[in-house]
Amino acid sequence: MQEHLIVTLDGTDYLVEPGTSLLEFIKSRDTFVPSICYNESMGPIQTCDTCMVEIDGKIERACSTVVNRPMTVNTQNNDVKASQKEALDRILEKHMLYCTVCDYNNGDCEIHNAMDAWGLEEQSYEYKTKPYEKDYGPFYRYDPDQCILCGRCVEACQDIEVNETISIDWNREHPRVIWDNDVPINESSCVSCGQCATVCPCNAMMEVNMEGNAGYMTDTEPGSLAAMIDLTKKAEPGDGLLFAVSDSEAEMRKERIKKTKTVCTYCGVGCSFDVWTKDREVLKVQPSHDSPANKIATCVKGKFSWGHINSDQRLTKPLVRKDGEFHEVEWDEALDVIETNFKRIKNEYGGDHLAFIASSKGTNEESYLMQKLSRQVFGSNNVDNCSRYCQAPATKGLFRTVGHGGDSGSIEDLERAAMTVLIGTNTAEAHPVIASRMKRAQKLFGQKMHVFDIRKHEMAARADAFYQPKPGTDLVWLGAATKYIIDNDLHDKAFLNDWVDNYEDYYKSLELFTMDFAEETTGIPKEQIISFAEEAAKAESMSICWAMGVTQQDIGSDTSTAISNLLLVTGNYRKPGSGAYPLRGHNNVQGASDMGSMPDQFPGYQKVADDEVRAKFEKEYGVELNPTPGRDNHQMMEGIHNGDIQSLYLYGEDTGIVDSNINFVQSALEKVDFLVVQDEFLTFTATYADVVLPASPSLEKDGTFTNTERRIQRINKALQPLGDSKPDWEIFQLIAQRMGADWNYKHPSEIMDEIAGLTPSYSGVNYERLQGFNSLQWPVAPDGTDQPTLYMDGFNFENGRAKLFPLTFDNFFKEDEVYDLHVNNGRLLEHFHEGNMTYQTEMIKYKVPNAFVEISPELAKDRDIHEGAELRLISETGEATLIATVTDRVKGREIYIPLNNDAMSNGDLGAINKLTNSDVDKYTDTPSYKRTSCRMEVLTRKGKSPLNPTNFRVDKQRNPQYSVQVQKKWERPDYVFPGNVVDK
């Protein structure tokens, strides 16, 4: 390792590690150098030229200089100051300073701050307007007149988000930011991640919700605002008065703009950020370099989809059904009805006749209390959560082989991996921020990406190798690839010898998985499987991600097991960039399971049948607990039909839409004696309820979420609950108290303390350790030490060794002459699942108003149907009517239906789960959502496309490039390097 180098900074010697950014080193010494285009999350862009310093006698940019030799650096002499002023003046030539009436005057305008800190008294070049109008997208707008062409937005779009939409046209007389090949924002391939607005150093790129709302004097009509700007320019002539006045106004804004750190309430990535609110209005979501899962990245939902918070469809009072209709009542009356019926059913039938479904949208603390309510108060283990619908098979596969039911590493490992494998996961739409990390690694650092999926989604289109197996056959090619690796002596023998058991039995089970069998069964040519196997074996590190395309099959547990087997055989656990990543769907589906909202497990995956474990919980709960595992979600519905379940209480779960075969589920909801639903809205499921309780969303409460990488993060209350709605944990406590339980929690932190005392994997978790952007990845030791990478001290079995698990395959998909189409389904980027929350944001609904069905060009030709055709799809269980879009994302007789359908407005007419059946994975009861067939009736042969023509999926042409292409700026005849001005 090279020794430290001596850097002499303004006359003082320092020892600096080789490879350090000079600008970062200068900043670390509390020495000011302006650096307007630089962002620590993106690195040097080199467009603003403000970071001029003298290095060994020569004026150079500090941002792009790496300490790789001893050097003498001066930041203060006259030449340096003159070159910095030249650069700052050139920026003010492009950007008008009217700070006091600017919505961005919130203390973090980097142009304002740089000019103020530098001490610029007056500018040398007059501001010049540009011949362009503002461009408004649905969520953010671009003002060319304020743009300094720093290129941060370009870097974010091209090389961080890797959507590759934004660039700068340097060839114009007046360069500007453009979208695609110079189209308006709303007509471009922009996916509205908002990262451009996040990183913009000024008000050029700004959230629409900020405009006219942030300042005391910014909500005026355009003409009046222009007059105020002119007045401001005269009153603030570029000297210190400008900053004094605007700084005072910025301080005043702090009294009405609240900034609260929270965590996104949508998918399992766990993006954290500050949410800016004024009264009840969400102005802005601002991620941070310190955000552990996402850094500065967001997607359209986390950045902009907050319309549900103030939706006029929010429930603000309890509802009780009387004479077949809902009536608003006070809390006491609703609780009276619940108490009476819960006690009646418990006394008449016993606690086992009540069932409880926890939400994966709620907090850890709330999921914990739901299972505690079920077990302590009612003596029932009939408690579950929506991991039953999606991730239970992945958890099963990991418990079989490595012993923990969670990601083996961190999101960072997916970026570090030499090779990533995506199986049955539409990552770019379901986990977009994770997808961006992998797209960046592939684009900039040469990561190899292999995608196995039946649908050609974005990640498939970007992949180095894309394979399209027949539905439900992933287990076969996985087995064949693993067998090939062993048979050709490519397996990691040292790893297997040191860390893995059951090799002989496992290898014997691979006899079936020949290349010929794999090719015939999967449809993937054996040459492609061999090529994949060889790359997987030789890769320095390999991570495998999978999701619903694997788990929502009737062999989801076995396929998940096969994935882990392959990782063990290639030695891809216990090292950076490797491991198993079952991408969790909801913001807290990992946490809901961690907290014991499952019929056979207490918090921390401790078995209810284990006498020692149960005794521990009995001591804490003060009652004898039921040792018999209860019913899961699927079994609850069967139990209602069989007369074994009389009451169902669920929160934050739209079971009547999201469960499989909702025809069967809806009839159960009609039949159950007493149904309590707790939610933000009168959901489709809530329409069946006897009592509906108004719950508060994440911005209105405190708590914690656990994301897909086992990362525990705090959410903080930003707003008061709307109307009489309450956080779920408070509602559970009210019900428990009505049932006679002594619950007296004052704050969720007390609930977490109780969790930590009972749950070894959370034993070191407390709110103090989760302040700000701090987080912990379980298991967490009592002293707060966590484990970003699992299994470094051995696998989670008694002997510390992993287990290869033998498998077989006899699950052949039989084509049906009547139901001749295979139905695939999944998320769209803009919506989350059924869309109850996302449909409340107007511009999200504008972009994707309804569900639709994707059909292939081949199928369209065969059936003589065209874009906009109205189709009735009929399966063995039900039917759905949808509008078609023709796309090569699907092929042959594969069709694809998004999960969102706005059931609160449209009912279940286009719901995918009208078609799905009741088949399940035999080990977990997870429904086989992806194993659905249907037939088609054509109602109309063509019509209006279901996709808004502005949607990014509709004939958009991205403009990929590397970074901002600053060389084109430097080649312009009007460009002058600030150091050259000094030299002259």
Curated annotation (Swiss-Prot):
<keyword id="KW-0500">Molybdenum</keyword>
<dbReference type="InterPro" id="IPR050123">
    <property type="entry name" value="Prok_molybdopt-oxidoreductase"/>
</dbReference>
<feature type="domain" description="4Fe-4S His(Cys)3-ligated-type">
    <location>
        <begin position="79"/>
        <end position="119"/>
    </location>
</feature>
<dbReference type="Pfam" id="PF13510">
    <property type="entry name" value="Fer2_4"/>
</dbReference>
<feature type="binding site">
    <location>
        <position position="37"/>
    </location>
    <ligand>
        <name>[2Fe-2S] cluster</name>
    </ligand>
</feature>
<dbReference type="GO" id="GO:0046872">
    <property type="term" value="F:metal ion binding"/>
</dbReference>
<feature type="binding site">
    <location>
        <position position="267"/>
    </location>
    <ligand>
        <name>[4Fe-4S] cluster 4</name>
    </ligand>
</feature>
<protein>
    <recommendedName>
        <fullName>Putative formate dehydrogenase SH0748</fullName>
        <ecNumber>1.17.1.9</ecNumber>
    </recommendedName>
</protein>
<feature type="domain" description="4Fe-4S ferredoxin-type 1">
    <location>
        <begin position="138"/>
        <end position="165"/>
    </location>
</feature>
<feature type="domain" description="4Fe-4S Mo/W bis-MGD-type">
    <location>
        <begin position="257"/>
        <end position="313"/>
    </location>
</feature>
<feature type="binding site">
    <location>
        <position position="99"/>
    </location>
    <ligand>
        <name>[4Fe-4S] cluster 1</name>
    </ligand>
</feature>
<feature type="binding site">
    <location>
        <position position="147"/>
    </location>
    <ligand>
        <name>[4Fe-4S] cluster 2</name>
    </ligand>
</feature>
<keyword id="KW-0479">Metal-binding</keyword>
<keyword id="KW-0004">4Fe-4S</keyword>
<dbReference type="InterPro" id="IPR006478">
    <property type="entry name" value="Formate_DH_asu"/>
</dbReference>
<dbReference type="GO" id="GO:0016020">
    <property type="term" value="C:membrane"/>
</dbReference>
<dbReference type="InterPro" id="IPR019574">
    <property type="entry name" value="NADH_UbQ_OxRdtase_Gsu_4Fe4S-bd"/>
</dbReference>
<dbReference type="GO" id="GO:0015942">
    <property type="term" value="P:formate metabolic process"/>
</dbReference>
<feature type="binding site">
    <location>
        <position position="150"/>
    </location>
    <ligand>
        <name>[4Fe-4S] cluster 2</name>
    </ligand>
</feature>
<dbReference type="GO" id="GO:0022904">
    <property type="term" value="P:respiratory electron transport chain"/>
</dbReference>
<dbReference type="GO" id="GO:0003954">
    <property type="term" value="F:NADH dehydrogenase activity"/>
</dbReference>
<dbReference type="InterPro" id="IPR027467">
    <property type="entry name" value="MopterinOxRdtase_cofactor_BS"/>
</dbReference>
<dbReference type="InterPro" id="IPR001041">
    <property type="entry name" value="2Fe-2S_ferredoxin-type"/>
</dbReference>
<feature type="binding site">
    <location>
        <position position="109"/>
    </location>
    <ligand>
        <name>[4Fe-4S] cluster 1</name>
    </ligand>
</feature>
<feature type="binding site">
    <location>
        <position position="157"/>
    </location>
    <ligand>
        <name>[4Fe-4S] cluster 3</name>
    </ligand>
</feature>
<feature type="binding site">
    <location>
        <position position="299"/>
    </location>
    <ligand>
        <name>[4Fe-4S] cluster 4</name>
    </ligand>
</feature>
<feature type="binding site">
    <location>
        <position position="196"/>
    </location>
    <ligand>
        <name>[4Fe-4S] cluster 3</name>
    </ligand>
</feature>
<feature type="domain" description="2Fe-2S ferredoxin-type">
    <location>
        <begin position="3"/>
        <end position="79"/>
    </location>
</feature>
<feature type="binding site">
    <location>
        <position position="51"/>
    </location>
    <ligand>
        <name>[2Fe-2S] cluster</name>
    </ligand>
</feature>
<comment type="similarity">
    <text>In the C-terminal section; belongs to the prokaryotic molybdopterin-containing oxidoreductase family.</text>
</comment>
<keyword id="KW-0520">NAD</keyword>
<feature type="binding site">
    <location>
        <position position="48"/>
    </location>
    <ligand>
        <name>[2Fe-2S] cluster</name>
    </ligand>
</feature>
<keyword id="KW-0408">Iron</keyword>
<dbReference type="InterPro" id="IPR017896">
    <property type="entry name" value="4Fe4S_Fe-S-bd"/>
</dbReference>
<dbReference type="InterPro" id="IPR006656">
    <property type="entry name" value="Mopterin_OxRdtase"/>
</dbReference>
<dbReference type="InterPro" id="IPR006657">
    <property type="entry name" value="MoPterin_dinucl-bd_dom"/>
</dbReference>
<feature type="binding site">
    <location>
        <position position="63"/>
    </location>
    <ligand>
        <name>[2Fe-2S] cluster</name>
    </ligand>
</feature>
<keyword id="KW-0001">2Fe-2S</keyword>
<dbReference type="InterPro" id="IPR041924">
    <property type="entry name" value="Formate_Dh-H_N"/>
</dbReference>
<keyword id="KW-0560">Oxidoreductase</keyword>
<dbReference type="InterPro" id="IPR006963">
    <property type="entry name" value="Mopterin_OxRdtase_4Fe-4S_dom"/>
</dbReference>
<dbReference type="Pfam" id="PF12838">
    <property type="entry name" value="Fer4_7"/>
</dbReference>
